[in-house]
Amino acid sequence: MSKDLVTFGDVAVNFSQEEWEWLNPAQRNLYRKVMLENYRSLVSLGVSVSKPDVISLLEQGKEPWMVKKEGTRGPCPDWEYVFKNSEFSSKQETYEESSKVVTVGARHLSYSLDYPSLREDCQSEDWYKNQLGSQEVHLSQLIITHKEILPEVQNKEYNKSWQTFHQDTIFDIQQSFPTKEKAHKHEPQKKSYRKKSVEMKHRKVYVEKKLLKCNDCEKVFNQSSSLTLHQRIHTGEKPYACVECGKTFSQSANLAQHKRIHTGEKPYECKECRKAFSQNAHLAQHQRVHTGEKPYQCKECKKAFSQIAHLTQHQRVHTGERPFECIECGKAFSNGSFLAQHQRIHTGEKPYVCNVCGKAFSHRGYLIVHQRIHTGERPYECKECRKAFSQYAHLAQHQRVHTGEKPYECKVCRKAFSQIAYLDQHQRVHTGEKPYECIECGKAFSNSSSLAQHQRSHTGEKPYMCKECRKTFSQNAGLAQHQRIHTGEKPYECNVCGKAFSYSGSLTLHQRIHTGERPYECKDCRKSFRQRAHLAHHERIHTMESFLTLSSPSPSTSNQLPRPVGFIS
């Protein structure tokens, strides 16, 4: 686009005293606003402009009308510009011919003219260029009218128009002009007033905004300050440093936000829950929790998210992209936070410490879940059975009990599981893998939870306490079972006889009465039992018999030995 210089005279509209008196207060205010804004726009763009007298008068609040200079006529004095208006189109005749295009600066203007006597004087490029200049002007529907010819023509079979290719605005200016009665009384002033009133309202200059171009990436800006900030992306310049931690930033606004980390300032507060934030953007994201708004939708699966960052992370599920790689072991992750958490495995860092028991965790989420052991908080409740859980993941897993869903299947034996963790543990039955070893006794386990439970046998730790009787347990499952003593809950019912039990293991043992199953067999006598405890008791008989045989007691002493008591199987 051409960058011809724009002068204030190109965009200024001057009124004589007589014309100024025609304007009502609203129109005069509009004139002041447009004139001052155009002047300031040129100054802000670095255009060398000496302050015109009319601007000085406007700034002082004085009447800006100018003494009209007679006898100054342009190259085509018989023409004026007005915007298409239904009030005037009925009185003004127009003429048409095939469309032509003339270049004015860098603007391509389409115009039509079909009156022979008008062509020679008014269709030169120099005339248009003199009238419009090279600035961009929103002239969506511009009509050319001729003062001398039009009154002589009475028919309405011609139509002429001069339109720009920029059809972005259609102006409605019917209310900008005097009523018909006043217009007829002051016909000489009407044309001049009409022209300048339209120019005042709509001949607002939009100087080419893309004036400043980045030499590295060709991106354009309308302000030098924006370009300067942008160029720091390429140069890496970060001139704003935090005096607390030395971290640097490319923008002062980013430094101001960062400082709130040190000061703890959180000036942006949610009106719903009173939660405060250090940045307005964080508040905006948080408010979607209350409104439920999820404006970012995945094109693949239509899942919606409240934050664009969450959508970006989710899309990697479809693409399989894992751009964040651990430099220690090469494991890759779909987002940076997962990598940061993973790296603590290598460093052993556990920055999150429980203020009750002092236990430390590598992830903040683990600490929050752990603290619910102390508080007893279970915020996630099942709508089916009202059972509550301390973690949402546990609720999701539990709900599969009601739905019967078992989406995770073993490829070896086709056994299905409701949780992927159960599948992982099960697969170790086939592989024999026991990766979790106790450092105290060397005993190995197939899953970490079993190791954690086992280690409490060495430490004596019993973190799970019954609120009713203060009895403690090493396992949460043990506490859950114990609490049924107080509640009387018996959720496990036999589908044969209807008898109910508080423990699933008790139901399993009971059902063997109906099925006749005796899975525990003695290796010595092949006798079988329904329960492992019964088998263990029975095996002591053989142990005692072996002891008696080896010791070879005399008949007198043998009568004094206790007789083994048989167990009813």
UniProtKB/Swiss-Prot annotation:
Residues 549-558 have a biased composition (Low complexity). It is found in: Nucleus. PROSITE patterns: KRAB, ZINC_FINGER_C2H2_1, ZINC_FINGER_C2H2_2. GO terms for biological process: regulation of transcription by RNA polymerase II. The keyword Nucleus applies. Disulfide bonds: none annotated. GO terms for cellular component: nucleus. A zinc finger (C2H2-type) spans 212-234, 240-262, 268-290, 296-318, 324-346, 352-374, 380-402, 408-430, 436-458, 464-486, 492-514, 520-542. May be involved in transcriptional regulation. This is Zinc finger protein 583. Residues 6-77 form the KRAB domain. Its main location: nucleus. It holds the Pfam family KRAB. Belongs to the krueppel C2H2-type zinc-finger protein family. InterPro entries: KRAB (IPR001909), KRAB_dom_sf (IPR036051), Znf_C2H2_sf (IPR036236), Znf_C2H2_type (IPR013087). Residues 549-569 are annotated as: Disordered. PANTHER family: GASTRULA ZINC FINGER PROTEIN XLCGF26.1-LIKE-RELATED, ZINC FINGER AND BTB DOMAIN-CONTAINING. Gene3D superfamilies: 6.10.140.140, Classic Zinc Finger. Keywords: DNA-binding, Metal-binding, Nucleus, Repeat, Transcription, Transcription regulation, Zinc, Zinc-finger. GO terms for molecular function: DNA-binding transcription factor activity, RNA polymerase II-specific; RNA polymerase II cis-regulatory region sequence-specific DNA binding; zinc ion binding. It comes from Homo sapiens.
